[in-house]
Amino acid sequence: MRAQTPSYVISVKLHLPKQIENRLEKSFRISNSVYNEGISFGLKRFEAMKRNPYYQELLKARRLAKAGIDKLKKAKKKTKGLVQQVKLHDKALLELRKAYGLTEFELQKYLSQQRRKTGSPYQQFNAGEIQVIAGQVMKTLEKVLFYQIKPHKVRFRSKFDLDVSFRNRVNTTGTRLEPSDKKDIAYRLYIHKASTFVDIPVKAFNKYQQMSLTYSEKIKYVQIIRKTIRGKKVYYLQIVCQGFPPSKVTKGQGVVGIDPGISTVAFASPTEVALVDLVPKNITQKEKHLKRLDRKIEQSQRVNNPECYKENGTIKKGARFKRPSKRQMHLRNRRRKMYRSLSEERTKLQGQLVNRIVSQASVIRVEGLNIKGLQKRSRDIRINPKTNRPYSKKRYGKAIFRAAPSALRVALETRASQLGIDVEVISPKEVKPSQYNHITQTFDKKSLSTRVYDLSDEYTGVQRDLYSAFLIGHIEKGRYQQEQLNQDFPD
């Protein structure tokens, strides 16, 4: 297994001649074909493995062992024997997957054999680029192997995909970046698919990017990305450097407690206490506009493909839609532009918030929040007593899509590691910060709708999230620092 080292990315816009763009477009199409062939090969091997009785027996035995572990945990009994059984089943399943060629190495081997065939269009890719595509294929197949998605839900790449990319494993062969001897030229990009060099001038990099390049230990590899912005194709070069980039902020002094929510985040430091909204401004108006665009796109599709729909308006099974019309493509581009602007605004807000937090912290304590669990549908069926109908099983999927709380957590941990700030994840099950009252030293369970409550007759109107963030900042080794809490709590 390759050693994992810290890295960061520098993006530069490329200005390419039309001839090179055409060659890149051809390479993107062939890259999609390689990926699709790998997916097709993997799904066929998976279906063959599913028909094996030994595989079915292993899955059944593992499922029973896992159910037994859950029962023993509820009864607070030892689970050592069953845990060993699960490990043995996992080992046997791994060997079976190897026997059926469902490993990254076997995928690399298969795609390399296809590349070496006489007249194969895959020959313009070197071995490193084929290995990268095989790794991407394996990531998708792992979701099928571990039953996170069903095989028919796997998405094949299309020639209509707007954002595509390819990269190499190293910066020594194939598509690579080399330093230039010319005065105003910073680097020379060798594009393997076009067999030509492209000069990248110094002015293409801003001051911070130039500083970041000098900080890098080495360039790991480069990646060429094609994005569609306002209906036009734009090419970017991503330079992946080893090491840490220069920081624009310096770390502070003190402990910062963070209580992350779905749409908001509360933090408490020695100098500031704040509750910040993660949702971009004017999102309600933009969402209404997106719904209108969705309806227009569907109407256009129905008009152009009437044979694909039944009389009641539902889609026929196995229906094949025609190529989208110009109007439909125009509407899709408008919708894509709106999603891109929302994403950029959200990323900008989160970056500003991360800088604001780390500039006040030498230690960060954050409550662990399982976002993956919150976006799933509820299993319980609850009946509304007024209408006698079941409540919706939907939970927080839309709110998570709006605010992207996991992206904030990743950005915070990345920035903290760059500045040498310790990040401690606090388990909410152990310390229960939303229930604890440091004045009475008791735990009082509250409903989710209760956002403001009274600690005592003296301390009234305490905001729940801010108080939880304050408590999280005063937890050490799974216990509340009672003396420090009494001392730091404002009068």
What function would you assign to each model-found segment?
Residues R2-N126, N305, R323, F489-P490:
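Long, compositionally biased intrinsically disordered regions
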Residues S11-K13, Q136, Y236-Q238:
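Beta-strand secondary-structure signal
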Residues G38, V132-L145, L466-E476:
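Stable alpha-helical structural segments in soluble proteins, enriched in small hydrophobic residues
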Residues Y8-L14, T196-V202, A274-D277:
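Generic detection of short hydrophobic beta-strand segments and adjacent strand-loop junctions
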